[in-house]
Amino acid sequence: MILLENGVRVFPKPGMGKDIYIGLANFGFENDVPELLGVAHLLEHILISFDYTRFVANASTARTYMSFWCRALRAEDYLAALETAVSWFFARGALRTDFSRVRIRNYVRELENEYYFRNEVFHCMDILTFLGGGDLYNGGRLSMLEQLDAVRELLGKRMRRLAGPNVVIFVRELSPAALALLERSFGTLPRFPSTIPATRLGSIHNKAVLVPAPFYALLIQVDNTVENVLAVICLAESYHFVDYETLGERLYVSFAFVHEQDCEAFLRNVGELRFEPAPRVELNYSDDYVMNLYVNFPWLQHDLADYLYTLNADCVPLLRGLEENLRRSVRERQLVVVYPSFSPSLFNSRDRQDHRLLVLDVDLARSAGPARVPRTFRRQPRAEVFVRYGDPALLDYVAFALARPRAAALRRLPRGVRLAHGFSHADMHEIMASETFIKYSRSRPAALFQYIFLAFFATGRSIAEILERREALVSFDARRCVNRLVFAKRARYDVVTKSSFVCGVLRGPRLSEAALTRAMWELKRKGLLYSLEHTRMHAKHTFYVFAFSIYPEQVYRYFARWQLVSKHCCVVSMRGEREDYSALRKEVVVNFV
C-alpha cells in the first residue's frame, strides 16, 4: 500500500479485472437521511461518464460508501482508463463542485426508471436504513424534481466533503505515470472535509420486521472493532450465510436461515454458540468484497494480506470473542429479526414512498423451548452447474444467484447459464425447495416478461400457450429457431400487464450489438430507461429488445423512428390490474414456413 500525504490509500492489484477501482468511505446514501434522499445516488449518475467504444465502467452507491471503476477495452488505453476515472471527480485540476450546467432533470428520470426496474425485478428493502430514519429505498425518486435548486446546492456540498483518508484506490498497474496522476488529483484533497454533516440515524433496538425476503435473518449489533471484523472475515470463509452490514459507525453481523426453526434455534442456543473455523483462512475474496472492507472500515490501514497471519494464528480466540459479544447483544436486545412475508395487506408501518411493512418488538421469552442445532451451510470446494434455457428449473437457479450474489456467480451462455457456487448438492436442493425461497422467487414475476415475449416472437407458440407456462422459463434457444419473421403493416401491439415495458423485434441492414449499445446510452441520457436487453435472432441483422420503462411511449417512438431500423414489430405494455393480451395475433406477426 502507498499512503499519499493527505491520507489517500493506493493499493497495487496486479490480478484485478479492473484497471482502476475507487472507493469513497462515508459517502453513501445514509448521508442523505438528514438532508434529501437520493442526492448520493444522483451524484453517482452525474459523475460517471465514458466512451463506451473504448472503456467499460460502472459505479454503485451503497448505504455507507460509493465505488467507481473503469477498464480499457484495449491494452494501449490503460492510462487513458485511469485518466477517465479521475476526470469524473476533477476538471482542469480542480475538484468538481459546480453542477449548474448539468441537466439534472434527465438524471432524475433515469433514477426513477432504475427504481422501477429494481422494484419490478427485485424487492428493494433496506431495513436498517428505514429503522434508522431513512426509507426502504433511498436511491432517489421523481419527487426530487420539485427541489432542483436545493439538489444542485447539495451536490456541490457533498463533493466538498471528500477527504483524503476516506479515499481508497486499487490500480492494476501502478506505474510512475499512474502514481503521478493520482497524486495531482486525489492527492490534492484536504485531509479533513470542509463540512461535517450531522448524520442523525436513530437507534435500532429489539425489532422484528416482516418484508419480502428469500431467507429468515438476524442482524445483531456488535462492537465495531478490528477483532470483530477479522472474526467475521474468518466466518465468511467457513459459512455461506454469515456476513456483516454497517450503519454509520455501527457494525452488524448478519445470519441468514432457510428455515424458521433454525433462526429460532440460533436465538435459543446463543448461550452455547460455538463457531467452527475453516482449516485455513485464504482470503479468497473478490475485488468488490475487499474494497467494501476498506471503505466500510477506514481504520484498516494495511493491505488485507498483512492480517493473514493473525487470521490463522488467532482465529479461534477471535471467534470466541465475537461469540461473547453476540450473546451480550442478544441479552440486551441489540438485534433485528427479519421474517419473510409476501402479504401486501399485512403491515403497520410505511416509509415516505408508501412502501409497507410490519414492524414489531421482539419477544425472546417466547423462544424458550427444546434445544435444536441450527442447520449450517458450510462452504464447499468451488463447483459449477450448467442449466439449459429450456430447463423448467432455470428460473430457480437464476433467483438463487440473485438472492446470494456473493455465493453464486451466474454467467449467461448461448444455450444456457453456468452457475459457479460453493454449496453441496444437498444444501442447494434444500434451499431451492424451501417454501420461503419458492415464494420469493415467484413474488416478482415481471422478470419473466422478457422471456414470454421472446418466446412469442421466436417460437411457434401463441401468447395464450406461453402464458399457461409462464412459471417455467421458456424452453427454447433463440439462436436455433429458424422461423422466418414476416413483419406486418401493423408494427405495434398494445397490451396491459402488471408492468410497464417495451419489447419487440427490430431489423435493419446496419443494426448491430454496438448500435444497440449506443441506443441504450442515448436513451439513458434522456432519462427514458435504465437498462436495455437485446438478443440476436436467427435472421440476419434482427434483434429482440426488451426494456422496463415508466415512459414506454417515448421509448417506442425512439425505435420506430430510428434510422437504423428498417422494420420493426413492437409490443408496448401499459401497467394495469387486469392483464389484456387480446391485441396479439400470432398469424399476423409471424409466418412459420
UniProtKB/Swiss-Prot annotation:
<comment type="similarity">
    <text>Belongs to the peptidase M44 family.</text>
</comment>
<protein>
    <recommendedName>
        <fullName>Probable metalloendopeptidase G1-type</fullName>
        <ecNumber>3.4.24.-</ecNumber>
    </recommendedName>
</protein>
<feature type="binding site">
    <location>
        <position position="41"/>
    </location>
    <ligand>
        <name>Zn(2+)</name>
    </ligand>
</feature>
<keyword id="KW-0862">Zinc</keyword>
<dbReference type="GO" id="GO:0004222">
    <property type="term" value="F:metalloendopeptidase activity"/>
</dbReference>
<keyword id="KW-0645">Protease</keyword>
<dbReference type="GO" id="GO:0006508">
    <property type="term" value="P:proteolysis"/>
</dbReference>
<feature type="active site">
    <location>
        <position position="44"/>
    </location>
</feature>
<comment type="function">
    <text>Seems to be involved in viral proteins maturation by cleavage at Ala-Gly-|-Xaa motifs.</text>
</comment>
<keyword id="KW-0378">Hydrolase</keyword>
<dbReference type="GO" id="GO:0019058">
    <property type="term" value="P:viral life cycle"/>
</dbReference>
<dbReference type="GO" id="GO:0008270">
    <property type="term" value="F:zinc ion binding"/>
</dbReference>
<dbReference type="Pfam" id="PF03410">
    <property type="entry name" value="Peptidase_M44"/>
</dbReference>
<dbReference type="InterPro" id="IPR011249">
    <property type="entry name" value="Metalloenz_LuxS/M16"/>
</dbReference>
<keyword id="KW-0479">Metal-binding</keyword>
<feature type="binding site">
    <location>
        <position position="45"/>
    </location>
    <ligand>
        <name>Zn(2+)</name>
    </ligand>
</feature>
<dbReference type="InterPro" id="IPR005072">
    <property type="entry name" value="Peptidase_M44"/>
</dbReference>
<keyword id="KW-0482">Metalloprotease</keyword>
